[in-house]
């Protein structure tokens, strides 16, 4: 089993970290750069910044925030939200991000994935997918515009297409689970993980360390995105990793030298 990644996710609105339930009822948590620095000290593997209103309101992400974070962090930074064009993609990377996450624009123009992969390399291209179960619960549907609009696309078919077009990673968020703290959507994750060969990052629903253990033991997810658990101080990244290792799940831990 490859080393599993723990990735704190910072949903950003108007330059502040926020958190809600099922994509609504947002509460302000704090400054994204300061939180990211804390998580890096706790041995986070990567950081994700998602501007959760940029796509819907068609706003551009402020490069200054990305630049601040890039200067302060030594771990990879993924940034998403409002990425509409190759120029947007280029600007985010130039600001200091290591990867760029695209969502709505990829569905509206799938060739965007191919163009980005060709110009910047597949390692920079993350396709974020927001999905929820259909009415019968038999399959999953993709949503865009920050989860506000049904794209009318089957999740598994879209994930396969993303891989074919050049996505280096899929960031899969369960809208049904988002913010509920009832555990990841294992059924959804298994459906996608079994259909693609690129890394899948699990997102939406983490409420405890046991939920993270479950997602790695019961799915082939490569990484777990975590928000509320860390933002509200219910656990630290290093505490999560210690429990993973106790459960024979490989995780990266850097031992701090005592001076």
UniProtKB/Swiss-Prot annotation:
Q: Which UniProt keywords apply?
A: Amino-acid biosynthesis, Cytoplasm, Histidine biosynthesis, Lyase
The residues annotated as the active site are 11, 130
Pathway assignment: Amino-acid biosynthesis; L-histidine biosynthesis; L-histidine from 5-phospho-alpha-D-ribose 1-diphosphate: step 5/9
Q: Which Pfam families match?
A: His_biosynth (PF00977)
Localization per record:
Cytoplasm
The Gene Ontology terms for molecular function here are:
imidazoleglycerol-phosphate synthase activity; lyase activity
Q: Whom does it interact with, and what assembly results?
A: Heterodimer of HisH and HisF.
The protein's name in its UniProt record: Imidazole glycerol phosphate synthase subunit HisF
The organism encoding this protein is Lactococcus lactis subsp. cremoris (strain MG1363)
């Amino acid at each position: 089993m490859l080393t599993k990644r723990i990735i704190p996710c910072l949903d950003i609105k108007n330059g502040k970290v926020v958190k809600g339930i099922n994509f609504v009822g947002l509460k302000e948590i704090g400054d994204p750069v300061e939180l990211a620095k804390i998580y890096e000290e706790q041995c986070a593997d990567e950081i994700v910044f998602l501007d959760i209103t940029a796509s819907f309101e068609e706003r551009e992400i402020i490069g200054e925030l990305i630049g601040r974070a890039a200067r302060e962090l030594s771990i990879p930074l993924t940034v998403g939200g409002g990425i509409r064009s190759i120029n947007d993609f280029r600007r985010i990377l130039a600001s200091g991000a290591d990867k760029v996450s695209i969502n709505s624009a990829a569905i509206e123009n799938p060739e965007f994935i191919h163009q980005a992969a060709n110009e910047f390399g597949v390692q920079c291209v993350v396709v974020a997918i927001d999905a929820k179960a259909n009415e019968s619960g038999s399959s999953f549907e993709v949503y865009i515009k920050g989860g506000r609009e049904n794209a009318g696309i089957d999740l598994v078919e879209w994930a396969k297409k993303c891989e074919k077009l050049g996505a280096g990673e899929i960031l899969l968020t369960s809208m049904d689970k988002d913010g509920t703290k009832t555990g990841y959507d294992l059924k959804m994750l298994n459906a996608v993980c079994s259909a693609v060969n690129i890394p899948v990052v699990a997102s939406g629903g983490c409420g405890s360390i046991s939920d993270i253990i479950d997602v790695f033991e019961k799915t082939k997810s490569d990484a777990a995105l975590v928000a509320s658990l860390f933002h509200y101080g219910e656990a630290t990244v290093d505490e999560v990793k210690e429990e993973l290792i106790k459960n024979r799940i490989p995780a990266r831990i850097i031992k701090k030298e005592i001076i």
